[in-house]
């Protein structure tokens, strides 16, 4: 039988197994409903990403686990052990990660509706990067950083105007997305110029996210090209140096038998050529 994941199998007794564990036995021991995950598979996925980062970027980068997949202390401890970074989108996820002992400097704080309390929490705990989504958040963060005597390292979420060829419900890189600032109409350029003049902020990089469940390399390559051109323009026009490019988007996985995912490392290889 061709399962959607390699860690699934059917045992001699006809029961489904996950990572070699009989699910009927797990149900008897722990009850149902239950979420069952294969730790070995999760760790191997992390290692595939990290090996690709080492091979194609000489280790000059960081792979981030998306907390929206599952936010709990055990997962965060695994991510720490596998030398991953994480992204969080709420004070709750940030709190859980910190309680798990995850290094604050490897946390990226995303989200398009951060509260002042959440921004303060990030500043107080020395979160590595705050990914700014809009002008209102930018002004709030600059004010709070000044009041607290901090300098925040920030990235901006950019809408690159990319069609990721995925379902409309999970597209995020198009011009009319509710997330981030637009590249096409000059909004992204203007907000970065504004931030560059703010005393309490350090503009480190730019970020984009083009959607989820993407089975093609081309949208990621195109996004990387547009973002690199934007970075070069900022340097040429305003002498603003962008040191980090954070490329986001969900690589396709096999939900159904008809899905044909690309090996994770192929995405990283393709983007590295840009």
Task: Write out the residue ranges for each language-model feature.
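Glycine-rich tight-turn/loop motif centered on a GG-T
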Residues: 31-35, 124-129, 168-182, 216-221, ...
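Conserved radical SAM core fold
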Residues: 71-75, 93-95, 116-118, 160-176, ...
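A charged N-terminal "starter" segment
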Residues: 1-153, 189, 193, 197-198, ...
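Non-membrane alpha-helical structural segments and their capping/turn regions in soluble enzymes
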Residues: 39, 43, 116, 135, ...
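C-terminal active-site-proximal or functional interface alpha/beta core segments in diverse enzymes
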Residues: 212-274
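A short small-residue
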Residues: 22-30, 205-211, 248-254
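Active-site/ligand-binding-proximal alpha/beta "capping" segment
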Residues: 158, 163-204, 208, 217-229
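Short beta-strand segments
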Residues: 66, 153-159, 207-209, 246-248
């Amino acid at each position: 039988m061709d399962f959607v994941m390699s860690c699934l199998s059917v045992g001699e007794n006809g029961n489904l197994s996950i990572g070699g564990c009989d699910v009927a036995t797990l149900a008897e021991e722990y009850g149902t409903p239950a979420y069952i995950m294969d730790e070995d598979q999760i760790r191997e996925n992390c290692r595939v990403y990290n090996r690709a980062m080492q091979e194609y970027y000489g280790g000059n980068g960081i792979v981030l686990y998306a907390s929206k997949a599952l936010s709990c202390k055990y997962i965060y401890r695994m991510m720490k052990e596998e030398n991953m970074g994480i992204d969080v989108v709420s004070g709750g996820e940030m709190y859980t990660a910190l309680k798990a002992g995850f290094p604050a400097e490897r946390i990226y704080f995303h989200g398009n509706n951060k509260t002042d309390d959440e921004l303060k929490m990030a500043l107080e705990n020395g979160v590595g990067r705050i990914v700014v989504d809009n002008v209102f958040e930018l002004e709030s963060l600059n004010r709070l950083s000044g009041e607290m005597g901090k300098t925040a390292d920030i990235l901006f979420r950019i809408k690159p105007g990319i069609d990721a060829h995925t379902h409309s419900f999970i597209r995020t890189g198009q011009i009319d997305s509710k997330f981030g600032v637009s590249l096409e109409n000059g909004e992204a350029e203007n907000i970065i110029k504004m931030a560059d003049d703010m005393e309490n902020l350090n503009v480190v990089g730019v970020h984009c996210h083009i959607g989820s469940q993407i089975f093609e390399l081309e949208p990621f390559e195109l996004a990387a090209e547009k973002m690199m051109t934007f970075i070069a323009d900022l340097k040429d026009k305003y002498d603003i140096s962008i040191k980090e490019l954070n490329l986001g988007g969900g690589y396709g996985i096999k939900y159904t038998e008809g899905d044909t995912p690309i090996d994770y490392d192929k995405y990283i290889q393709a983007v590295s050529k840009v």
